[in-house]
UniProtKB/Swiss-Prot annotation:
GO terms for molecular function: K48-linked deubiquitinase activity. GO terms for cellular component: centriolar satellite; centriole; centrosome; cytoplasm; spindle pole. The modification N-acetylmethionine is found at residue 1. Residues 73-283, 343-533 form a coiled coil. Residues 570-603 are annotated as: Disordered. Keywords: Acetylation, Cell cycle, Cell division, Coiled coil, Cytoplasm, Cytoskeleton, DNA damage, Mitosis, Phosphoprotein, Ubl conjugation. Interacts with CEP152 and CDK1; these interactions recruit both ligands to centrosomes. Interacts with CDK2, CDK5RAP2, WDR62, CEP90, KIAA0753/moonraker and CCDC14. CEP63, CDK5RAP2, CEP152, WDR62 are proposed to form a stepwise assembled complex at the centrosome forming a ring near parental centrioles. Interacts with CCDC57; the interaction is required for their location to proximal end of centrioles. Interacts with FXR1; promoting its stabilization. Polyubiquitinated via 'Lys-48'-linked ubiquitin, leading to its degradation. Deubiquitinated by USP36, promoting its stabilization. The gene is Cep63. CEP63 and DEUP1 paralogs are both involved in centriole amplification: while CEP63 mediates mother-centriole-dependent centriole duplication, DEUP1 mediates de novo centriole amplification in multiciliated cells. It comes from Mus musculus. Pfam families: CEP63 (PF17045). Required for normal spindle assembly. Plays a key role in mother-centriole-dependent centriole duplication; the function also seems to involve CEP152, CDK5RAP2 and WDR62 through a stepwise assembled complex at the centrosome that recruits CDK2 required for centriole duplication. Reported to be required for centrosomal recruitment of CEP152; however, this function has been questioned. Also recruits CDK1 to centrosomes. Plays a role in DNA damage response. This is Centrosomal protein of 63 kDa.
Amino acid sequence: MEALLEGIQNRGHSGGFLTSCEAELQELMKQIDIMVAHKKSEWEGQTHALETCLDIRDRELKALRSQLDMKHKEVGILHQQIEEHEKTKQEMAMEYKEELLKLQEELSRLKRSYEKLQKKQLREFRGNTKSFREDRSEIERLTGKIEEFRQKSLDWEKQRLIYQQQVSSLEAQRKALAEQSEIIQAQLANRKQKLESVELSSQSEIQHLNSKLERAKDTICANELEIERLNIRVNDLMGTNMTILQDHRQKEEKLRESEKLLEALQEEQKELKASLQSQETFILEAKMQEKLQTTLKAVGTQQSVERPLEDCQKERKYSSPGQGVLDNVLSQLDFSHSSEELLQAEVTRLEGSLESVSATCKQLSQELMEKYEELKRMEGHNNEYRTEIKKLKEQILQADQTYSSALEGMKMEISQLTRELHQRDITIASAKCSSSDMEKQLKAEMQKAEEKAVEHKEILSQLESLKLENHRLSETVMKLELGLHEAKEISLADLQENYIEALNKLVSENQQLQKDLMSTKSELEHATNMCKKKDGEIFNPAHSRAAGFKNAELKPIHGQHRHDGIKTEQYKTGHHSPRGQTLDSIDPVARGPSPLSSHISPGSSTVSLPSNFLFEAHSLPSVLDINDVNFSDSLSDCMNDQEEFVSSGSLPTSPLGSIATRFLEEEELRSHHILERLDAHIEELKRESEKTVRQFTALV
C-alpha cells in the first residue's frame, strides 16, 4: 500500500513537470515558427526583388535586341535599295550599250551602202566620164549626207550632255550617300551615348545589387546564427525530453511493480476465496448433518431420546471451534472485500493516470516528431535557400561576366566603328578631294572643249566663207568659160594674171587654213599628251585602234592612187610639206596654156569643197573614218576623171583632201578619247559610289 501511494505521488509530480515542459516547448515552437516565417518572408522579398531586377535587365536586353533588329532591318532595306539602284544603273548601261550597238549597226549599214555607192560610182567614173553637173549633184548628195552626219554629231553631242547629266546625278547620289554617312555617324554617336548611359545605369544597378547581396549575406549569417541558437535550444529540449522519457520509464517500472502487487493481491484474494469456499462447504456439510439429524430424530424417537446428549455434545464440540473459524473467515472476507475495493479504486485511478500519462507522452512524442519534421524541413528550406543563393550568386557573377564581356565587346565594336568611321571619313575626304579634282579637270576639259568648239565654229565659218568664195569664183570661171569665145579680144596674159592672182589668193587662204590646222593639231596633241599622262591605260587601246584604222585607210588610198605616182607621193608627204605641194600645184598652172587653166579652176574649187566637208564632220566617232577616206578617194577619182577629160597634161591637184582627212582622223580620235574619258569618269564615279556603299554596309 505504501508503495502504491509513493508511485501515485511520483506520478502526480511527474505529470506537473510534463505540463510545464509542454508549455515551454509550445512557446519555443511558436517563437521558432514566428522567426522562421519572418526570415522566410524576408528571403522571399529578397528573392522577389532579385527576380524583378533580373526581369528588368531581361527587358532592357530585349529592347536593345529589338533596336538592333530594327537597325539590321534598316541596313537590309538600304542594301535592297542599293541593289535596286545598281540594277537600274546596269539596265541603263545595257540600254545605252544597245543604243550604241544600234548606232554602230546603222553606221556599218550606211558604210556598206556608201561603199556600194562608191564602187558603183567608181565603175561609172571608170566606164564613162560624166559632166560637171553630175559631179555637182553628187557633191550635193554628199553634202546632204554630211549634213546627216552633222545631225548625228549633234545627236552625239546630246548623248554627251546626257552622260554629263548622268555624271551630275551620280555626283548628287554621292552627296546623298555622304549625307547618309553623316546621318549614320550621328546615329552611331547617339547609340554610343545611349550605351554609355546604359553602362552607367547598369553599373549603378550592379552596385545596388551588390549592396543587396551583402545585406542578404548579413541576413543569412544572422539567420545561421539564429538557426544555431535554435539548434542549441532544440538540443536542450531534447535533453529535457530525454529526462522526461527516463521519468516515464521509471513510472512504467513503478506501474509494473504495482501490477505485480495487484497480481499478489489477486492471488491472496483467490486464496481467500478458496478458503471461503472450503468454509462454505464445511458449513453446508454441517447443515446437511443437521438435516440428517432432524431426519434421524423423526425416524426414531429412541435414537433421539437416546442420543440427545451425544448430539448436543457433538454440536458443542463442533460449534465452538467452527464459530471461531467462521468469525475469523468472515473478518478476513470483510477485510479482503474492503482491500479489494480499495485496490480496484487504486487500479482504476492508476489506469486513468497511466492513460493520461500515455496520452501526454504520445502527444509529446508527436510534437517532437513534428518539430523534428519541421527542423528537417527548415534544414531542407535552408539548404534550398543556400542553393538558391549560390545560384543567384553564380547568375549574378555570370551576368557580371557577360555584362563585362558585352561591355568589352561593345567598347571594341565602338572603337572599331570609330576607326572605321575615321577611315571612312578619310576615304570620303580623299574621295571628295579626288572628286573635286576630277570636277576641276572635267571643268577644265569642258572649257577646253568649249574653246575648241568655238574655234571649230570659227573655222567652220571661215570654211563657209571660203566655200562661198570658191562658189563665187567657180561662177566667175564658168562665166569666163562661157564668155571665152565672146571675149576673144581679151589677151591671154591678162587672163593668166587674173587667174594667177585668184590662185595666189586661194593658196594664201589655204596656207592660212593649214596654219590654223597645225595650231589646232598642236593644241590637240598637247591635250592628248596631258590625257595620256593622266589616263594612259585608257588611251593606249584607242591609239592602237586609231592606228589600225589609219593603216586600213592608207591601203585603199594607195590602191586608188596607183594611176598617178606623183599624187600618192604627195598624199604620203602631204602633212609634212604642204607649202611645197601648193607651190608644185601652182607651177604647172603658170606653165600651162590658157584654155587648160579655165578647166582647172573648177577642179580647185571641187578640191576645196571636200576639205570644207571634212572640217564640218570633225565631231563624228571613229567608225566614220573609212567613210571619210572613201569619200576623199571618190573625190580624187573624180579629179582623175576630170583630168583625163581635160585631155592635155594631167595637172596635180592641191593636197587639201589628204590634210583634211588627216585632221578629221585626229579630230575623231580626240572625240573618241573624250567619250572614253567621260565613260571612264562615269565608271570611276560608279566604283566610288559602290565603294562608299560597301563601306556603309560593312560599318552597319
